[in-house]
Curated annotation (Swiss-Prot):
Single GO BP term: arginine catabolic process to glutamate
Protein's name according to its UniProt entry: N-succinylarginine dihydrolase
InterPro entries in alphabetical order: AstB_sf, SuccinylArg_d-Hdrlase_AstB
Protein's organism: Shewanella denitrificans (strain OS217 / ATCC BAA-1090 / DSM 15013)
Gene name of the record: astB
Catalytic activity line of the entry: N(2)-succinyl-L-arginine + 2 H2O + 2 H(+) = N(2)-succinyl-L-ornithine + 2 NH4(+) + CO2
Lineage start: Bacteria, Pseudomonadati, Pseudomonadota, Gammaproteobacteria, Alteromonadales
Length: 444
């Protein structure tokens, strides 16, 4: 039986905009109020996904959320027709309207945490949608996320879906952006590394001072229990609070792993040596810890370029490749480091660069755009085949984007009631292309 890692990229939604909603995310804040190009953003994401499929990788797509989210706006007291709800919110509470129009679900690294069947006691692939309670605009995602995941990974013989964790700061969960699975081979049991920002129930434990720690130890432990993971296949490691305060809002901004490689900045973690020893002890394979020193790449350069928000993939040839944003080429220190990295004798042998600038300007690089799902060939056969990237789907989705998406969207445009009609028309057609059924509230 073959085993491999599939990547499921989030399709960029029609309301992609720069409202600067994510405190602690430097790129999101610094580009607030710029005019976005939803059509270009969606096409950039599709091109990156298709490029990985063309490399021989198993690549899928996940549908975006319904936005504007009129159901949340009605729940908080705005009434009338759909157009009146939008107009009232724009006048009385524009910040709330902005939150209900966010296309942030494109960053599917935050959609859920996934544990493969090789790690779980019941031998199923487990999914838990992230509750994303730290950010209003993302906290309204989990129910629809669950619908989309269930429509993509449908067969209960292979896939186990859990409800998101309780919606409280104690269980703040940001999904796979704070989770890396380390292993020798994808089909062998591995070590699931859960990285957290603070302990919610321990006021004396280290935590950041300036920006919020979005992931708690308690949430990570709950996910491990739900996913039926053994103690010997889990490691819980704290992210350095100082780097959170420098804009490292998720662990995938400061480290990334694949199989037996963990690529990380030397300032990424607390108690690094002891925790790496624990990983080595629990692994059934040799580990390569690839450290980037501050003298080579500063935290500031790492955050601006998203050096660590890259993907490390294993090609069908067995060779590892980094999928990086073109921003890494444009940063002299980062580009020099990556050119050196491929000569150092690690399993990482090449770097490929892709333009995802529309996403980058909102604070999300290549790793943010994908949810990793390790599968075997039987499990892959049970996945909704209409969500898997190939030439035909790439063509259909590009045509769909060209038909439905605007090429310019400013924050003030979010008050246009026509955006509701455009978005729902697009998503209704998308559910037919991907054969998802009725995953959105407006379809029910």
């Amino acid at each position: 039986m073959k085993h491999f890692e599939a990547n499921f990229d989030g399709l960029v939604g029609p309301t992609h905009n720069y409202a600067g909603l994510s405190f602690g995310n430097v790129a999101s804040y610094s580009n607030a109020a710029q005019t976005a190009n939803p059509k270009a953003a969606a096409k950039q994401g599709l091109q990156k996904a298709k490029a990985l499929a063309d490399l021989g990788m198993t690549q899928g797509v996940l549908a975006p959320q319904e936005r504007p989210d009129l159901y949340t706006l009605r729940r908080i007291g705005f009434s009338g027709s759909d157009a009146e709800v939008i107009q009232k919110a724009a006048k009385q509470a524009p910040a709330l309207l902005n939150a209900c129009c966010s296309a942030s679900s494109m960053w599917t690294a935050n959609a859920a945490t996934v544990s493969p069947s090789a790690d779980t006691r019941d031998g199923k692939v487990h999914f838990t949608p992230a509750n994303l309670v730290d950010k209003l605009h993302r906290s309204i995602e989990p129910i629809t996320t669950a619908n989309i995941l269930k429509a993509t990974f449908k067969d209960p013989h292979f896939f186990q879906h859990h409800a998101h964790l309780p919606e409280h700061a104690h269980f703040g969960d940001e999904g796979a952006a704070n989770h890396t699975r380390l292993c020798g081979e994808y089909g062998h049991s591995g070590v699931e590394l859960f990285v957290y920002g603070q302990e919610a129930t321990n006021p004396n434990a280290p935590k950041p001072k300036k920006y919020p720690a979005r992931q708690t130890l308690e949430a990570s432990q709950a996910i491990a229990r739900l996913h039926q993971l053994e103690d010997e296949s889990t490691v819980f490691m704290q992210q350095n609070p100082d780097v959170i305060d420098q804009g490292v809002f998720h662990n995938d901004v400061i480290s990334v792993g694949n199989q037996n490689v963990l690529f990380y900045h030397e300032q990424a973690f607390l108690n690094t040596d002891a925790k790496f020893d624990e990983i080595r002890r629990k692994m059934n394979a040799d580990m390569h810890f690839v450290k980037v020193a501050t003298s080579q790449v500063s935290i500031d350069d790492a955050v601006k370029s998203y050096l660590f928000n890259t993907q490390i993939i294993t090609l069908p040839s067995g060779e590892m490749t980094i999928i990086a944003p073109t921003d890494c080429q444009e940063n002299l220190a980062v580009f020099a480091y990556l050119n050196e990295l491929v000569t150092l004798g690690t399993p990482i042998k090449q770097v490929r660069y892709y333009d995802v600038k529309q996403s980058m300007q909102n604070g999300g690089g290549p790793a943010c755009l994908r949810l990793r799902v390790a599968l075997n060939d039987q499990e892959l056969a049970a996945v909704n085949q209409d969500t898997l990237m190939n030439d035909a789907l790439f063509g259909r989705l590009n045509t769909w984007v060209e038909k439905h998406y605007r090429d310019s969207l400013s924050v003030k445009d979010l008050a246009d009631p026509q955006l509701i009609v455009e978005s729902r028309t697009a998503l209704d057609e998308l559910t037919q292309i991907l054969k998802l059924g009725s995953v959105y509230q407006f379809q029910k």
